[in-house]
Amino acid sequence: MATITTLASSVPLFRPYSFPGGSSRKPKKDNLSIKPPATSSLKVNAKLASADDTSSNFNKDNWLASADELSRSFPPGFLFGGGSASYQYEGAVKEGGRTPSIWDTFAHEFPDKIADGSNGDVAVDFYHRYKDDVKLMKKIGVNGFRFSISWTRILPSGKLCGGVNKEGVAFYNSLINELLANGIEPFVTIFHWDLPQGLENEYDGFLSGQIVNDYRDYAEVCFQEFGDRVKFWTTLNEPWTFCYNGYVNGSFAPGRCSTCTAGNSGTEPYLVAHNLLLSHAAVAQLYKNKYQASQKGQIGIVLVCFWMVPYSDCPYDCEAAQRALDFMLGWFLHPLTYGDYPESMRHLVGERLPQFTEMQAMMMKGSIDFLGLNYYTSIYAANNESPNPHDISYTTDSRVNLFQKRDGILIGPATGTPAFCFCPEGIRDLLVYTKEKYNNPIIYITECGLAEANINTVDQGVKDVERVEFYYEHLKFLRSAIKKGVNVKGFFTWSLLDDWEWNSGFNVRFGIVYIDHEDGLKRYLKYSALWFKKLFGK
Protein backbone atom coordinates (compact mmCIF):
# COMPACT_ATOMS: atom_id res chain seq x y z
CA MET A 1 0.00 0.00 0.00
CA ALA A 2 1.29 3.45 0.70
CA THR A 3 -0.79 6.22 -0.75
CA ILE A 4 -4.32 7.61 -0.29
CA THR A 5 -7.13 9.50 -1.98
CA THR A 6 -9.96 11.48 -0.57
CA LEU A 7 -11.02 11.30 2.95
CA ALA A 8 -14.42 12.01 4.19
CA SER A 9 -16.31 10.77 7.16
CA SER A 10 -14.73 7.45 7.72
CA VAL A 11 -11.09 7.14 6.87
CA PRO A 12 -9.68 6.18 3.54
CA LEU A 13 -6.27 4.87 3.48
CA PHE A 14 -3.69 4.85 0.77
CA ARG A 15 -3.22 7.38 -1.83
CA PRO A 16 -3.03 11.08 -1.30
CA TYR A 17 -6.13 12.39 0.33
CA SER A 18 -7.94 15.63 0.59
CA PHE A 19 -9.58 16.02 3.96
CA PRO A 20 -13.08 17.31 4.56
CA GLY A 21 -14.06 20.30 6.56
CA GLY A 22 -11.81 23.04 7.84
CA SER A 23 -8.88 22.96 10.15
CA SER A 24 -10.85 23.92 13.22
CA ARG A 25 -14.37 23.73 14.51
CA LYS A 26 -16.21 23.50 17.80
CA PRO A 27 -17.98 20.18 18.38
CA LYS A 28 -21.70 20.42 18.84
CA LYS A 29 -24.16 18.16 20.54
CA ASP A 30 -25.31 15.31 18.35
CA ASN A 31 -29.01 15.31 17.51
CA LEU A 32 -28.92 11.73 16.28
CA SER A 33 -30.17 8.59 17.92
CA ILE A 34 -26.73 7.52 19.17
CA LYS A 35 -26.22 8.32 22.82
CA PRO A 36 -22.79 9.45 24.00
CA PRO A 37 -20.93 7.22 26.44
CA ALA A 38 -20.75 8.24 30.07
CA THR A 39 -17.02 7.64 29.84
CA SER A 40 -14.69 6.65 27.07
CA SER A 41 -11.40 4.80 26.94
CA LEU A 42 -10.35 7.03 24.06
CA LYS A 43 -8.91 10.16 25.61
CA VAL A 44 -7.81 13.25 23.73
CA ASN A 45 -4.37 12.64 22.18
CA ALA A 46 -4.59 9.04 23.43
CA LYS A 47 -1.39 9.28 25.42
CA LEU A 48 -1.13 5.80 26.84
CA ALA A 49 2.26 6.30 28.39
CA SER A 50 4.62 9.05 29.31
CA ALA A 51 7.11 7.56 31.74
CA ASP A 52 8.52 5.08 29.26
CA ASP A 53 11.46 5.00 26.86
CA THR A 54 9.93 6.98 24.01
CA SER A 55 11.61 10.36 24.49
CA SER A 56 13.47 11.42 21.37
CA ASN A 57 17.26 11.42 21.26
CA PHE A 58 17.53 11.62 17.47
CA ASN A 59 20.38 13.73 16.15
CA LYS A 60 20.13 14.55 12.44
CA ASP A 61 23.83 15.32 12.32
CA ASN A 62 24.68 11.89 13.72
CA TRP A 63 21.78 9.88 12.33
CA LEU A 64 23.60 6.56 12.10
CA ALA A 65 24.32 6.45 15.83
CA SER A 66 20.62 6.19 16.66
CA ALA A 67 20.62 2.61 15.38
CA ASP A 68 22.75 1.58 18.35
CA GLU A 69 20.02 2.61 20.79
CA LEU A 70 17.56 0.17 19.23
CA SER A 71 19.89 -2.61 18.11
CA ARG A 72 19.17 -4.89 21.06
CA SER A 73 15.56 -3.84 21.66
CA PHE A 74 13.75 -6.68 19.94
CA PRO A 75 13.49 -10.35 20.89
CA PRO A 76 15.28 -13.22 19.13
CA GLY A 77 13.40 -14.39 16.06
CA PHE A 78 11.88 -10.96 15.42
CA LEU A 79 11.32 -10.50 11.68
CA PHE A 80 12.65 -7.33 10.09
CA GLY A 81 11.89 -7.02 6.42
CA GLY A 82 10.90 -4.92 3.45
CA GLY A 83 7.55 -4.87 1.70
CA SER A 84 6.43 -5.05 -1.91
CA ALA A 85 3.44 -5.89 -4.12
CA SER A 86 3.32 -7.60 -7.50
CA TYR A 87 1.84 -4.80 -9.63
CA GLN A 88 3.96 -2.15 -7.92
CA TYR A 89 7.22 -4.05 -8.41
CA GLU A 90 7.27 -6.73 -11.06
CA GLY A 91 6.60 -5.06 -14.41
CA ALA A 92 6.73 -7.61 -17.26
CA VAL A 93 2.95 -7.36 -17.50
CA LYS A 94 2.83 -9.15 -20.86
CA GLU A 95 5.59 -11.66 -20.20
CA GLY A 96 5.68 -15.15 -18.77
CA GLY A 97 2.04 -15.96 -19.51
CA ARG A 98 0.58 -13.17 -17.37
CA THR A 99 -2.74 -11.63 -18.41
CA PRO A 100 -4.27 -8.25 -17.45
CA SER A 101 -5.53 -7.41 -13.99
CA ILE A 102 -7.98 -4.65 -13.13
CA TRP A 103 -4.99 -2.41 -12.40
CA ASP A 104 -3.60 -2.83 -15.91
CA THR A 105 -6.97 -1.78 -17.26
CA PHE A 106 -7.46 1.08 -14.82
CA ALA A 107 -4.01 2.63 -15.30
CA HIS A 108 -4.26 2.48 -19.09
CA GLU A 109 -7.89 3.54 -19.48
CA PHE A 110 -7.81 6.28 -16.82
CA PRO A 111 -4.29 7.77 -16.88
CA ASP A 112 -5.83 11.02 -15.63
CA LYS A 113 -6.46 9.24 -12.30
CA ILE A 114 -2.73 8.55 -11.92
CA ALA A 115 -0.81 11.62 -10.72
CA ASP A 116 1.89 11.38 -13.39
CA GLY A 117 -0.12 9.39 -15.96
CA SER A 118 2.16 6.38 -15.54
CA ASN A 119 1.39 2.69 -15.10
CA GLY A 120 2.94 -0.51 -13.78
CA ASP A 121 3.96 -1.98 -17.14
CA VAL A 122 7.62 -1.86 -16.10
CA ALA A 123 7.31 -0.67 -12.49
CA VAL A 124 10.78 -1.35 -11.03
CA ASP A 125 11.37 -4.43 -13.20
CA PHE A 126 11.57 -6.80 -10.25
CA TYR A 127 10.53 -9.67 -12.54
CA HIS A 128 13.90 -9.50 -14.28
CA ARG A 129 16.03 -8.15 -11.43
CA TYR A 130 14.83 -10.09 -8.40
CA LYS A 131 18.09 -11.98 -7.90
CA ASP A 132 20.07 -8.76 -7.67
CA ASP A 133 17.40 -7.29 -5.40
CA VAL A 134 17.65 -10.28 -3.08
CA LYS A 135 21.39 -9.64 -2.89
CA LEU A 136 20.59 -6.08 -1.83
CA MET A 137 18.27 -7.42 0.87
CA LYS A 138 21.04 -9.64 2.19
CA LYS A 139 23.46 -6.73 2.14
CA ILE A 140 21.06 -4.63 4.21
CA GLY A 141 20.52 -7.54 6.58
CA VAL A 142 16.76 -8.06 6.48
CA ASN A 143 15.55 -11.53 7.47
CA GLY A 144 12.12 -11.25 5.84
CA PHE A 145 10.63 -10.10 2.54
CA ARG A 146 6.96 -9.46 2.01
CA PHE A 147 5.70 -9.89 -1.54
CA SER A 148 2.43 -10.69 -3.26
CA ILE A 149 1.65 -13.20 -5.96
CA SER A 150 0.06 -11.99 -9.18
CA TRP A 151 -3.18 -13.96 -9.59
CA THR A 152 -2.97 -13.82 -13.41
CA ARG A 153 0.62 -15.08 -13.45
CA ILE A 154 -0.66 -18.25 -11.81
CA LEU A 155 -4.12 -18.56 -13.40
CA PRO A 156 -4.18 -16.45 -16.59
CA SER A 157 -7.95 -16.85 -16.98
CA GLY A 158 -8.49 -16.19 -13.28
CA LYS A 159 -9.98 -19.66 -12.97
CA LEU A 160 -8.52 -23.08 -12.32
CA CYS A 161 -10.40 -24.52 -15.29
CA GLY A 162 -8.37 -22.23 -17.57
CA GLY A 163 -5.16 -23.94 -16.52
CA VAL A 164 -2.14 -23.20 -14.34
CA ASN A 165 0.63 -21.12 -15.89
CA LYS A 166 3.88 -23.02 -15.42
CA GLU A 167 6.02 -19.97 -16.19
CA GLY A 168 4.37 -18.01 -13.40
CA VAL A 169 4.84 -20.86 -10.95
CA ALA A 170 8.49 -21.14 -11.97
CA PHE A 171 9.07 -17.42 -11.35
CA TYR A 172 7.73 -17.50 -7.81
CA ASN A 173 9.49 -20.79 -7.06
CA SER A 174 12.76 -19.21 -8.13
CA LEU A 175 12.10 -16.08 -6.04
CA ILE A 176 11.23 -18.12 -2.95
CA ASN A 177 14.28 -20.33 -3.36
CA GLU A 178 16.53 -17.30 -3.83
CA LEU A 179 15.19 -15.70 -0.67
CA LEU A 180 15.65 -18.84 1.42
CA ALA A 181 19.15 -19.41 0.06
CA ASN A 182 20.03 -15.96 1.40
CA GLY A 183 18.47 -16.47 4.82
CA ILE A 184 15.36 -14.40 4.09
CA GLU A 185 11.88 -15.58 5.10
CA PRO A 186 9.18 -15.27 2.40
CA PHE A 187 6.08 -13.50 3.78
CA VAL A 188 3.50 -13.98 1.06
CA THR A 189 0.30 -12.09 0.24
CA ILE A 190 -2.15 -14.02 -1.92
CA PHE A 191 -4.21 -11.00 -3.04
CA HIS A 192 -2.90 -7.43 -3.21
CA TRP A 193 -5.65 -5.80 -5.32
CA ASP A 194 -4.64 -7.06 -8.80
CA LEU A 195 -7.84 -8.98 -9.53
CA PRO A 196 -7.95 -10.77 -12.90
CA GLN A 197 -9.71 -8.54 -15.43
CA GLY A 198 -11.44 -11.63 -16.78
CA LEU A 199 -13.31 -12.15 -13.51
CA GLU A 200 -14.23 -8.47 -13.36
CA ASN A 201 -15.66 -8.78 -16.86
CA GLU A 202 -17.51 -12.02 -16.17
CA TYR A 203 -19.26 -11.28 -12.88
CA ASP A 204 -17.95 -7.95 -11.49
CA GLY A 205 -15.26 -9.54 -9.35
CA PHE A 206 -15.74 -9.15 -5.60
CA LEU A 207 -19.23 -7.75 -6.07
CA SER A 208 -20.29 -11.34 -6.73
CA GLY A 209 -20.28 -14.30 -4.39
CA GLN A 210 -18.87 -16.35 -7.27
CA ILE A 211 -15.47 -14.91 -6.42
CA VAL A 212 -15.17 -17.07 -3.30
CA ASN A 213 -14.70 -20.35 -5.15
CA ASP A 214 -12.36 -18.88 -7.76
CA TYR A 215 -10.25 -17.22 -5.10
CA ARG A 216 -10.10 -20.44 -3.09
CA ASP A 217 -8.99 -22.37 -6.19
CA TYR A 218 -6.25 -19.82 -6.87
CA ALA A 219 -5.06 -19.90 -3.26
CA GLU A 220 -4.96 -23.69 -3.29
CA VAL A 221 -2.61 -23.65 -6.27
CA CYS A 222 -0.36 -21.34 -4.25
CA PHE A 223 -0.43 -23.70 -1.26
CA GLN A 224 0.30 -26.70 -3.48
CA GLU A 225 3.16 -25.08 -5.38
CA PHE A 226 4.83 -22.96 -2.69
CA GLY A 227 3.54 -24.08 0.70
CA ASP A 228 6.36 -26.50 1.41
CA ARG A 229 8.65 -23.45 1.78
CA VAL A 230 6.33 -20.53 2.62
CA LYS A 231 5.56 -20.40 6.35
CA PHE A 232 3.73 -17.06 6.43
CA TRP A 233 0.64 -16.51 4.30
CA THR A 234 -1.71 -13.54 4.28
CA THR A 235 -4.95 -13.90 2.38
CA LEU A 236 -5.71 -10.23 1.67
CA ASN A 237 -3.85 -6.95 1.78
CA GLU A 238 -5.82 -4.02 3.19
CA PRO A 239 -9.35 -4.97 2.20
CA TRP A 240 -10.41 -1.58 3.60
CA THR A 241 -8.32 0.27 1.00
CA PHE A 242 -9.58 -1.98 -1.79
CA CYS A 243 -13.17 -1.23 -0.77
CA TYR A 244 -12.77 2.47 -0.03
CA ASN A 245 -10.69 3.57 -2.99
CA GLY A 246 -12.17 1.05 -5.41
CA TYR A 247 -15.87 1.36 -4.54
CA VAL A 248 -16.43 4.50 -2.42
CA ASN A 249 -14.50 7.20 -4.28
CA GLY A 250 -13.37 5.35 -7.42
CA SER A 251 -9.75 6.47 -7.19
CA PHE A 252 -8.43 2.89 -7.45
CA ALA A 253 -9.31 -0.02 -9.70
CA PRO A 254 -12.00 -0.94 -10.56
CA GLY A 255 -12.97 2.73 -10.24
CA ARG A 256 -16.57 2.43 -9.08
CA CYS A 257 -18.55 4.95 -7.00
CA SER A 258 -21.85 6.82 -6.93
CA THR A 259 -20.43 9.66 -9.03
CA CYS A 260 -18.40 7.40 -11.33
CA THR A 261 -19.71 5.87 -14.56
CA ALA A 262 -20.91 2.91 -12.48
CA GLY A 263 -21.18 2.06 -8.81
CA ASN A 264 -22.97 2.83 -5.55
CA SER A 265 -20.90 4.18 -2.66
CA GLY A 266 -23.61 3.29 -0.16
CA THR A 267 -23.97 -0.40 -0.96
CA GLU A 268 -21.07 -1.78 -3.00
CA PRO A 269 -18.28 -1.26 -0.44
CA TYR A 270 -20.16 -3.36 2.10
CA LEU A 271 -20.91 -6.10 -0.40
CA VAL A 272 -17.31 -6.23 -1.59
CA ALA A 273 -16.00 -6.31 1.99
CA HIS A 274 -18.41 -9.13 2.80
CA ASN A 275 -17.19 -11.21 -0.14
CA LEU A 276 -13.58 -10.45 0.74
CA LEU A 277 -14.17 -11.73 4.27
CA LEU A 278 -15.95 -14.84 3.00
CA SER A 279 -13.07 -15.44 0.58
CA HIS A 280 -10.57 -15.09 3.40
CA ALA A 281 -12.54 -17.49 5.60
CA ALA A 282 -12.80 -20.09 2.83
CA VAL A 283 -9.07 -19.99 2.13
CA ALA A 284 -8.09 -20.00 5.81
CA GLN A 285 -10.33 -23.02 6.40
CA LEU A 286 -8.82 -24.78 3.39
CA TYR A 287 -5.27 -24.16 4.58
CA LYS A 288 -5.92 -25.19 8.16
CA ASN A 289 -7.83 -28.34 7.21
CA LYS A 290 -5.69 -29.57 4.34
CA TYR A 291 -2.19 -28.06 4.39
CA GLN A 292 -1.19 -26.60 7.73
CA ALA A 293 -0.35 -29.85 9.51
CA SER A 294 2.07 -31.00 6.81
CA GLN A 295 3.43 -27.61 5.70
CA LYS A 296 3.64 -26.18 9.22
CA GLY A 297 2.88 -22.61 8.20
CA GLN A 298 0.60 -19.88 9.48
CA ILE A 299 -2.14 -17.89 7.78
CA GLY A 300 -3.35 -14.39 8.53
CA ILE A 301 -4.64 -11.20 6.97
CA VAL A 302 -3.25 -7.67 6.53
CA LEU A 303 -5.41 -4.77 7.73
CA VAL A 304 -4.71 -1.06 7.88
CA CYS A 305 -5.81 1.65 10.28
CA PHE A 306 -5.06 5.21 11.26
CA TRP A 307 -4.98 5.92 14.96
CA MET A 308 -8.10 7.98 15.69
CA VAL A 309 -7.58 10.82 18.16
CA PRO A 310 -10.74 12.47 19.57
CA TYR A 311 -10.99 16.04 18.29
CA SER A 312 -11.91 17.23 21.76
CA ASP A 313 -12.63 15.75 25.19
CA CYS A 314 -16.35 16.04 24.43
CA PRO A 315 -17.96 12.59 24.91
CA TYR A 316 -19.45 12.82 21.41
CA ASP A 317 -15.99 13.18 19.86
CA CYS A 318 -14.62 10.33 21.98
CA GLU A 319 -17.42 8.13 20.71
CA ALA A 320 -16.77 9.35 17.16
CA ALA A 321 -13.16 8.20 17.44
CA GLN A 322 -14.39 4.76 18.49
CA ARG A 323 -16.82 4.64 15.55
CA ALA A 324 -14.04 5.62 13.17
CA LEU A 325 -11.96 2.70 14.46
CA ASP A 326 -14.97 0.42 14.06
CA PHE A 327 -15.54 1.50 10.46
CA MET A 328 -11.89 1.11 9.45
CA LEU A 329 -10.31 -1.66 11.54
CA GLY A 330 -13.35 -3.25 13.16
CA TRP A 331 -15.12 -3.66 9.82
CA PHE A 332 -12.78 -6.60 9.22
CA LEU A 333 -11.15 -7.51 12.53
CA HIS A 334 -14.40 -7.66 14.50
CA PRO A 335 -15.85 -10.47 12.29
CA LEU A 336 -12.50 -12.27 12.37
CA THR A 337 -12.47 -12.13 16.16
CA TYR A 338 -16.13 -12.26 17.17
CA GLY A 339 -17.99 -13.49 14.07
CA ASP A 340 -19.94 -10.32 13.23
CA TYR A 341 -19.57 -6.67 12.31
CA PRO A 342 -19.24 -4.03 15.04
CA GLU A 343 -22.51 -2.98 16.65
CA SER A 344 -21.99 0.61 15.51
CA MET A 345 -21.87 -0.51 11.89
CA ARG A 346 -24.91 -2.74 12.22
CA HIS A 347 -26.83 0.13 13.80
CA LEU A 348 -25.79 2.87 11.37
CA VAL A 349 -25.61 0.97 8.07
CA GLY A 350 -28.70 -1.12 8.73
CA GLU A 351 -30.00 -3.34 5.97
CA ARG A 352 -27.26 -2.21 3.57
CA LEU A 353 -24.77 -4.20 5.68
CA PRO A 354 -24.81 -7.89 4.66
CA GLN A 355 -25.26 -10.53 7.33
CA PHE A 356 -23.26 -13.66 8.00
CA THR A 357 -25.01 -16.98 8.31
CA GLU A 358 -24.30 -18.93 11.46
CA MET A 359 -21.94 -21.22 9.55
CA GLN A 360 -20.13 -18.29 7.93
CA ALA A 361 -19.69 -16.64 11.31
CA MET A 362 -18.17 -19.84 12.69
CA MET A 363 -15.75 -20.04 9.75
CA MET A 364 -14.79 -16.40 10.21
CA LYS A 365 -14.25 -16.35 13.95
CA GLY A 366 -10.70 -17.24 14.91
CA SER A 367 -9.63 -17.83 11.30
CA ILE A 368 -6.32 -15.96 11.58
CA ASP A 369 -3.14 -17.27 13.16
CA PHE A 370 -1.74 -13.74 13.18
CA LEU A 371 -2.68 -10.20 12.19
CA GLY A 372 -0.70 -8.10 9.76
CA LEU A 373 -1.23 -4.45 10.68
CA ASN A 374 -0.26 -1.48 8.51
CA TYR A 375 0.23 1.90 10.18
CA TYR A 376 1.06 5.24 8.57
CA THR A 377 -0.52 8.09 10.51
CA SER A 378 -2.98 9.42 13.10
CA ILE A 379 -5.93 11.74 12.54
CA TYR A 380 -8.50 13.70 14.55
CA ALA A 381 -12.02 12.26 14.66
CA ALA A 382 -15.01 14.49 15.44
CA ASN A 383 -18.69 13.76 15.71
CA ASN A 384 -20.66 14.73 12.60
CA GLU A 385 -23.66 16.42 14.15
CA SER A 386 -25.50 17.12 10.89
CA PRO A 387 -25.03 14.40 8.27
CA ASN A 388 -26.69 14.96 4.91
CA PRO A 389 -29.67 12.56 4.84
CA HIS A 390 -29.49 12.47 1.03
CA ASP A 391 -25.82 11.47 0.90
CA ILE A 392 -25.97 7.72 1.44
CA SER A 393 -22.38 6.55 1.41
CA TYR A 394 -19.81 4.66 3.45
CA THR A 395 -18.09 8.01 4.04
CA THR A 396 -21.13 9.44 5.84
CA ASP A 397 -22.44 6.28 7.51
CA SER A 398 -20.03 6.49 10.45
CA ARG A 399 -21.17 10.05 11.27
CA VAL A 400 -17.58 11.05 11.80
CA ASN A 401 -15.58 13.91 10.35
CA LEU A 402 -11.82 13.47 10.10
CA PHE A 403 -9.36 16.34 10.40
CA GLN A 404 -5.60 16.65 10.13
CA LYS A 405 -5.65 19.98 11.95
CA ARG A 406 -6.98 21.23 15.26
CA ASP A 407 -6.90 24.96 15.94
CA GLY A 408 -4.94 25.36 12.73
CA ILE A 409 -2.14 23.02 13.81
CA LEU A 410 -1.38 19.72 12.05
CA ILE A 411 -1.62 16.58 14.18
CA GLY A 412 2.01 15.95 13.24
CA PRO A 413 4.68 17.20 10.81
CA ALA A 414 3.72 16.98 7.14
CA THR A 415 5.24 14.29 4.89
CA GLY A 416 5.49 13.74 1.14
CA THR A 417 2.01 12.23 1.13
CA PRO A 418 -0.54 14.91 2.11
CA ALA A 419 -2.74 12.41 3.92
CA PHE A 420 0.03 11.13 6.19
CA CYS A 421 1.37 13.25 9.02
CA PHE A 422 4.33 12.06 11.09
CA CYS A 423 2.68 10.61 14.24
CA PRO A 424 4.91 7.85 15.64
CA GLU A 425 3.10 7.55 18.99
CA GLY A 426 0.03 6.36 17.08
CA ILE A 427 1.64 3.02 16.29
CA ARG A 428 1.89 2.26 20.01
CA ASP A 429 -1.64 3.46 20.72
CA LEU A 430 -3.13 1.45 17.85
CA LEU A 431 -1.24 -1.68 18.92
CA VAL A 432 -2.33 -1.40 22.55
CA TYR A 433 -5.93 -0.78 21.44
CA THR A 434 -5.84 -3.84 19.17
CA LYS A 435 -4.43 -5.97 21.98
CA GLU A 436 -7.17 -4.92 24.39
CA LYS A 437 -10.08 -4.91 21.94
CA TYR A 438 -9.27 -8.02 19.92
CA ASN A 439 -7.89 -10.62 22.32
CA ASN A 440 -4.17 -9.87 22.03
CA PRO A 441 -3.44 -11.43 18.62
CA ILE A 442 0.04 -12.13 17.32
CA ILE A 443 0.83 -9.05 15.23
CA TYR A 444 3.29 -8.25 12.48
CA ILE A 445 3.63 -4.63 11.40
CA THR A 446 3.43 -5.43 7.71
CA GLU A 447 3.74 -1.84 6.45
CA CYS A 448 5.06 1.38 7.93
CA GLY A 449 6.84 4.02 5.92
CA LEU A 450 7.47 7.62 4.95
CA ALA A 451 6.82 9.15 1.54
CA GLU A 452 9.08 11.77 0.02
CA ALA A 453 7.99 13.87 -2.96
CA ASN A 454 9.91 15.91 -5.53
CA ILE A 455 13.02 13.77 -5.22
CA ASN A 456 14.61 13.61 -8.67
CA THR A 457 18.35 13.03 -8.24
CA VAL A 458 20.34 10.22 -6.71
CA ASP A 459 22.27 12.55 -4.42
CA GLN A 460 19.05 14.07 -3.12
CA GLY A 461 17.26 10.74 -2.87
CA VAL A 462 19.80 8.73 -0.91
CA LYS A 463 20.19 11.33 1.85
CA ASP A 464 16.86 10.48 3.48
CA VAL A 465 17.64 11.51 7.06
CA GLU A 466 13.94 12.27 7.61
CA ARG A 467 13.12 8.64 6.85
CA VAL A 468 15.78 7.47 9.29
CA GLU A 469 14.17 9.65 11.96
CA PHE A 470 10.75 8.28 10.98
CA TYR A 471 11.82 4.68 11.54
CA TYR A 472 13.78 5.49 14.68
CA GLU A 473 10.74 7.12 16.28
CA HIS A 474 8.25 4.46 15.15
CA LEU A 475 10.44 1.60 16.33
CA LYS A 476 10.80 3.24 19.74
CA PHE A 477 7.02 3.40 20.12
CA LEU A 478 6.76 -0.14 18.79
CA ARG A 479 9.22 -1.22 21.48
CA SER A 480 7.03 0.56 24.03
CA ALA A 481 3.99 -1.40 22.82
CA ILE A 482 5.87 -4.68 23.20
CA LYS A 483 6.76 -3.73 26.77
CA LYS A 484 3.05 -3.17 27.38
CA GLY A 485 2.34 -6.75 26.40
CA VAL A 486 1.46 -6.40 22.72
CA ASN A 487 2.50 -9.58 20.93
CA VAL A 488 4.44 -8.05 18.02
CA LYS A 489 6.66 -10.50 16.13
CA GLY A 490 7.94 -8.48 13.18
CA PHE A 491 8.22 -5.18 11.32
CA PHE A 492 8.28 -4.59 7.57
CA THR A 493 9.25 -1.27 6.01
CA TRP A 494 7.15 0.18 3.26
CA SER A 495 8.85 -0.09 1.03
CA LEU A 496 12.06 -1.92 0.25
CA LEU A 497 12.43 -0.16 -3.11
CA ASP A 498 10.98 3.05 -4.45
CA ASP A 499 8.08 1.63 -6.42
CA TRP A 500 5.01 2.51 -8.49
CA GLU A 501 2.64 3.96 -5.90
CA TRP A 502 -0.83 3.32 -7.29
CA ASN A 503 -2.57 6.60 -8.13
CA SER A 504 0.51 8.56 -7.10
CA GLY A 505 2.50 6.85 -9.83
CA PHE A 506 6.21 7.51 -9.45
CA ASN A 507 5.67 10.93 -7.85
CA VAL A 508 6.38 9.75 -4.31
CA ARG A 509 9.13 7.53 -2.94
CA PHE A 510 8.70 5.20 0.02
CA GLY A 511 11.73 2.96 -0.43
CA ILE A 512 14.90 2.53 1.59
CA VAL A 513 16.52 1.80 -1.77
CA TYR A 514 16.54 4.55 -4.40
CA ILE A 515 15.44 3.72 -7.95
CA ASP A 516 16.97 5.94 -10.64
CA HIS A 517 14.38 6.24 -13.40
CA GLU A 518 16.79 8.39 -15.43
CA ASP A 519 19.46 5.70 -15.57
CA GLY A 520 17.98 2.30 -16.27
CA LEU A 521 16.35 1.77 -12.87
CA LYS A 522 19.67 1.47 -11.08
CA ARG A 523 19.43 0.77 -7.35
CA TYR A 524 21.19 2.82 -4.64
CA LEU A 525 21.10 2.20 -0.90
CA LYS A 526 19.69 5.21 0.96
CA TYR A 527 20.83 6.38 4.36
CA SER A 528 17.79 4.55 5.77
CA ALA A 529 19.04 1.25 4.34
CA LEU A 530 22.46 1.87 5.91
CA TRP A 531 20.73 2.69 9.19
CA PHE A 532 18.84 -0.60 9.13
CA LYS A 533 22.05 -2.40 8.22
CA LYS A 534 23.65 -1.04 11.38
CA LEU A 535 20.52 -1.81 13.40
CA PHE A 536 20.80 -5.44 12.31
CA GLY A 537 24.49 -5.52 13.18
CA LYS A 538 25.56 -6.13 9.60
UniProtKB/Swiss-Prot annotation:
Catalytic activity annotation: 7-[beta-D-apiofuranosyl-(1->6)-beta-D-glucopyranosyloxy]isoflavonoid + H2O = a 7-hydroxyisoflavonoid + beta-D-apiofuranosyl-(1->6)-D-glucose
Residues reported in the UniProt entry to bind a beta-D-glucoside: 88, 192, 237-238, 376, 447, 494, 501-502, 510
Protein's recorded name: Furcatin hydrolase
Chloroplast found in the keyword field: yes
GO molecular-function term, one example from the UniProt record: beta-apiosyl-beta-glucosidase activity
Stored InterPro entries: Glyco_hydro_1, Glyco_hydro_1_N_CS, Glycoside_hydrolase_SF
Transit peptide: 1-66
Subcellular location: Plastid, Chloroplast
Originating species: Viburnum furcatum
Family that this chain belongs to: Belongs to the glycosyl hydrolase 1 family.
Thermal dependence: Optimum temperature is 40 degrees Celsius. Stable below 50 degrees Celsius.
Disulphide bonds in the chain: 257-260
Enzyme class: hydrolase
Pfam families tied to this protein: Glyco_hydro_1
Domain of life of the native organism: Eukaryota
An annotated GO BP: carbohydrate metabolic process
Keyword field: Chloroplast, Disulfide bond, Glycosidase, Hydrolase, Plastid, Transit peptide
Tissue: Expressed in young and mature leaves, but not in fruit and stem.
PANTHER family per the UniProt record, alphabetical: BETA-GLUCOSIDASE 31-RELATED (PTHR10353:SF318), GLYCOSYL HYDROLASE (PTHR10353)
